[in-house]
């Protein structure tokens, strides 16, 4: 907020204003000149809060301190809004279990670092016509990730790949666990195949 965006001190000129203090003080309905005098006596600023109110509302405050704190809050909020990092892990339909274990180990490390993980199974030859083999691999992965991550929506077929995004589980209070399980039933092979058939029907 800049001084150009608000009216304060001598720029406020109303016959009557509702004047309040920064700590809840109520000075009542007085002229803007009287309100400014109160602010000056306290070594503070008179700031117009609501020009549309009847009468307009003004607040006695340290405007520079208010602006500094407001800008600080905005900067802190931007720092918290970190871009989500997505790690991609490729698999094949013929992958051995020990290789899945190795890749899932790294995926779990990414999840623990608050990253999202996208598993992509490569479909070769006729596999691209039927993604069941790819879904089987993803389902095996899901059972190994379910204690740490939640699948985002359902698997997607993308050309020669079938993919599934996993995101870190949100920390929930114990009392909400039962409700969460009821509202979010675990994925299973039947659900996955239903989703695949539904996607084919849409095509």
From Swiss-Prot:
Entry-linked PROSITE patterns: IF3 (PS00938)
Keywords: Cytoplasm, Initiation factor, Protein biosynthesis
Disulfide feature: none
Record's subcellular location: Cytoplasm
InterPro entries, A to Z: T_IF-3_C_sf (IPR036788), T_IF-3_N_sf (IPR036787), Translation_initiation_fac3_CS (IPR019813), Translation_initiation_fac_3 (IPR001288), Translation_initiation_fac_3_C (IPR019815), Translation_initiation_fac_3_N (IPR019814)
Region Disordered: start-end pairs: 172-203
GO biological process: ribosome disassembly
Transmembrane parts of this sequence: none
Biased composition (Basic and acidic residues): 172-182
Pfam families, A to Z: IF3_C, IF3_N
Main location: cytoplasm
Entry's Gene Ontology molecular function annotations: ribosome binding; translation initiation factor activity
UniProt GO cellular component terms: cytosol; membrane
Function: IF-3 binds to the 30S ribosomal subunit and shifts the equilibrium between 70S ribosomes and their 50S and 30S subunits in favor of the free subunits, thus enhancing the availability of 30S subunits on which protein synthesis initiation begins.
Family according to the record: Belongs to the IF-3 family.
Quaternary assembly: Monomer.
Protein known as: Translation initiation factor IF-3
